[in-house]
Amino acid sequence: MAVQRTFSILKPDATERNLTGAINALIEKAGLRIVAQKRIRMTREQAETFYAVHKERPFFGELVDFMISGPVVVQVLEGEDAVLKHRDVMGATDPSKAADGTIRKLHAKSIGENSVHGSDAPETAAIEIAQFFSGNEIVG
């Protein structure tokens, strides 16, 4: 296994309930290091760019509105097989189908308000990280 970096967002439904510490604890317990983190309020342009892959989907507008509705915490995570490890600790998109002990099972409100985003591949992670962090902000 190789050490990888992946990208994570703690979404507005998580930050409004002050879950950053609880979610970070689950991430770290899964063996991932948080090597960069900042709390921001996404602009509409940032959210539209970030979720451009979904632009033609019927939920795109609602997704963008949700992501700009409150603060988010953007993160760079590092560890062995980080992308898969993070996806495992996040759990299924639908919290009712997520495994016990996962972030979404414990904290998500719904499929739409599912508390966390994680990159789906190392290549995607590199693109997503570059959207929110400069090299000198990643201090792992």
Swiss-Prot record:
Similarity-based family: Belongs to the NDK family.
Q: What is its EC number?
A: 2.7.4.6
Quaternary structure annotation from Swiss-Prot or TrEMBL: Homotetramer.
* Protein residues bound to ATP: K11, F59, R87, T93, R104, N114
Q: Which domain of life is it from?
A: Bacteria
Q: Which GO terms describe its molecular function?
A: ATP binding; metal ion binding; nucleoside diphosphate kinase activity
Please list the GO biological process terms of this entry. CTP biosynthetic process; GTP biosynthetic process; UTP biosynthetic process
**Species whose genome carries this gene:** Rhodopseudomonas palustris (strain BisA53)
Q: Name the catalysed reactions.
A: a 2'-deoxyribonucleoside 5'-diphosphate + ATP = a 2'-deoxyribonucleoside 5'-triphosphate + ADP; a ribonucleoside 5'-diphosphate + ATP = a ribonucleoside 5'-triphosphate + ADP
Q: What does this protein do?
A: Major role in the synthesis of nucleoside triphosphates other than ATP. The ATP gamma phosphate is transferred to the NDP beta phosphate via a ping-pong mechanism, using a phosphorylated active-site intermediate.
Q: Which cofactor does it need?
A: Mg(2+)
Question: Can the keyword Heme be found in this entry's annotation?
Answer: no
Q: What is its main location?
A: cytoplasm
User: Record's GO cellular component, any one?
Assistant: cytoplasm
What UniProt keywords are attached to this protein's entry? ATP-binding, Cytoplasm, Kinase, Magnesium, Metal-binding, Nucleotide metabolism, Nucleotide-binding, Phosphoprotein, Transferase
Q: Which Pfam families match?
A: NDK
* Gene name of the record: ndk
The protein's name is Nucleoside diphosphate kinase
**Active site, per annotation:** H117
What InterPro entries does the entry give? NDK-like_dom (IPR034907), NDK-like_dom_sf (IPR036850), Nucleoside_diP_kinase (IPR001564), Nucleoside_diP_kinase_AS (IPR023005)
Q: Does the keyword Phosphoprotein apply?
A: yes
What the entry lists under PROSITE patterns is as follows: NDPK, NDPK_LIKE
Q: Where does it live in the cell?
A: Cytoplasm
Q: Which SUPFAM superfamilies match?
A: Nucleoside diphosphate kinase, NDK
The first-level EC class reads transferase
